[in-house]
């Protein structure tokens, strides 16, 4: 379906190009260097070396395309594991058609949407999946395009928007990448993913009202989580015997409804923005019984292995099936304030908070200890709530349940030089939730941008991350994991 869709857009673009209209393009070339502060060793993470945007408008129709080249530095050049010299890939980030009407606009294609009132980390910004390689970037740079249709209708001070996508979008995670500071505790194999089945449509809408002193927005979105969850276990036996069971450990994606409220208050002295989202998520996999592909998890081998070998009876009987049936309510909120201080310094602060309101799930009714990769548990002590991670909302929830951010920005030399100082503090106390202002982890950032010419920019940045050794999660604490990611980076960026 997707190749046919893009072929149709390309044919339409070709037709528009030969008709009346105007075409414009812009982009950049980015030379990027990043190294650890600890030992100056190179950090081999992918980044977008080249980006090209193209716009063509013919009367009330417009085509927009964004093509990027992602460069992935090689850790070596021995060519022992692969003989290919290619170290980049092309990414068509956006390609969509816009039809401007007398009531608004209609967009169809692969596009990046922006929902919410705050500049960054909005819990309402759930339409697109995130690329975690670009987690520390801003705006659309850290999002993945969604194959969708969007509608915007304008009437006086009102705005109505809607979006519909026939595809389920998932986050891009760095898998077993030692260079990336955040890792997933469990990385399932493809065979362990339980198919959503049918057409996993995602849709949402918002209604916005503008006032002289700001605006107010109500929104709703229904879709599937961007991150997988543990959905259940099947226990297989040899015929009627379950003496030596083998397991099929399954993961899936919960279905989530998001109710949102956001707004902006403008004044002569400051601007306040806020977003609040209430999430209701449930596991739709009530029946997880299915045939296996010949491989099942062996507790003795501690890995997936063929379930039928010479001299061993086949595992052909599904004896037990335990769907988790998670049902969770949680909320996320982000409040932002920005103002101008003396000496033309722009001050911005953000407060983020997330918590679980209600949690329920089935219990695994197994008496013996189950040994599963990366989470060994006994039925009496295992609490599935400890595995819960929000599948929608701001990616900031991956780092902490409660943070506060401060940013100072100042320009010099007739806006040719821009200095930014940023700090992020984890104030979520894991031992006593009533103590809300204890600092457990921190991130400090310094960035200097200098416009060498109108088209050439030089950037220098330093990021320092600190965890806390006495945190109850020890090495699993996110800020402890990220300490080694403290780095210095330099960029030379040419715009055209």
Sequence positions of predicted segments:
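Repeated loop/turn-to-beta-strand initiation elements of outer-membrane beta-barrel proteins
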Residues: 23, 60-65, 103-106, 157-160, ...
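Transmembrane beta-strands of outer-membrane beta-barrel pores
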Residues: 31-37, 58-60, 69-73, 101-103, ...
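Residues that define the transmembrane beta-barrel architecture of outer-membrane proteins
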Residues: 42-48, 88-93, 143-147, 154, ...
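Residues on the lipid-exposed face of transmembrane beta-strands in outer-membrane beta-barrel proteins
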Residues: 50-56, 94-99, 149-153, 205-209, ...
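Outer membrane beta-barrel
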Residues: 57-180, 212, 463, 467
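Solvent-exposed loop segments that connect transmembrane elements
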Residues: 77, 178-188, 229-251, 284-323, ...
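C-terminal structural cap/anchor segments
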Residues: 328-439, 443
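Outer-membrane beta-barrel "beta-signal"
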Residues: 480-496
């Amino acid at each position: 379906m997707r190749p046919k869709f893009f072929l149709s857009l390309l044919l339409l673009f070709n037709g528009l190009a030969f008709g009346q209209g105007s075409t414009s393009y812009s982009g950049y070339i980015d030379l990027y260097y990043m190294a650890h502060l600890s030992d100056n060793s190179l950090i081999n993470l992918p980044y977008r070396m080249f980006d090209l945007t193209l716009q063509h408008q013919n009367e009330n129709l417009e085509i927009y395309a964004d093509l990027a080249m992602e460069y992935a530095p090689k850790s070596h050049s021995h060519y022992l594991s692969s003989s290919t010299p290619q170290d980049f890939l092309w990414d068509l980030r956006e390609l969509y058609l816009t039809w401007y009407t007398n009531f608004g606009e209609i967009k169809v294609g692969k596009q990046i949407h922006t929902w919410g009132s705050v500049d960054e980390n909005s819990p309402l910004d759930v339409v697109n999946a995130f690329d975690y390689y670009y987690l520390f970037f801003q705006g659309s740079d850290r999002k993945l395009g969604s194959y969708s249709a969007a509608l915007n209708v304008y009437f006086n001070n009102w705005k109505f928007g809607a979006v519909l996508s026939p595809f389920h979008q998932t986050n891009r995670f760095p898998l077993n990448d030692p260079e990336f500071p955040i890792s997933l505790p469990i990385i399932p194999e493809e065979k362990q993913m339980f198919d959503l089945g049918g057409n996993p449509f995602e849709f949402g809408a918002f209604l916005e009202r503008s006032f002289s002193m700001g605006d107010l927005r109500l929104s709703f979105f229904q879709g599937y989580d961007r991150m997988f969850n543990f959905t259940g276990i099947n226990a297989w036996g040899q015929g009627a015997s379950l003496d030596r069971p083998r397991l099929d450990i399954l993961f899936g994606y919960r279905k989530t409804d998001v109710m949102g409220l956001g707004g902006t208050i403008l004044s002569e002295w400051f601007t306040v923005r806020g977003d609040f989202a209430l999430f209701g998520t449930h596991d739709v996999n009530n029946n997880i019984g299915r045939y296996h592909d010949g491989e099942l998890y062996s507790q003795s081998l501690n890995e997936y292995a063929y379930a039928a070998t010479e001299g061993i009876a086949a595992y052909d009987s599904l004896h037990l099936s335990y769907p988790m049936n998670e049902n969770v309510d949680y909320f996320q909120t982000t409040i932002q304030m920005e103002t101008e201080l003396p000496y033309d310094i722009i001050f911005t602060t953000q407060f983020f908070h997330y918590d679980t309101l209600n949690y329920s799930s089935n219990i695994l009714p197994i008496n013996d200890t189950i040994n599963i990769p990366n989470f060994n548990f006994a039925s009496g002590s295992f609490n599935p709530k400890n595995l819960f991670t929000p599948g929608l909302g701001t990616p900031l929830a991956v780092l902490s349940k409660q943070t506060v951010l401060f940013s100072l920005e100042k320009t010099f030399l007739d806006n040719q030089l821009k200095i930014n100082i940023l700090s992020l503090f984890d104030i979520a106390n894991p031992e006593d939730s009533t103590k809300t202002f204890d600092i457990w982890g921190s991130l400090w950032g310094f960035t200097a941008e200098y416009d060498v010419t109108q088209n050439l920019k030089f950037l220098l940045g330093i990021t320092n991350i600190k965890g806390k050794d006495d945190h109850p999660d020890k090495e699993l604490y996110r800020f402890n994991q990220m300490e080694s990611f403290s780095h210095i980076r330099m960029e030379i960026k040419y715009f055209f």
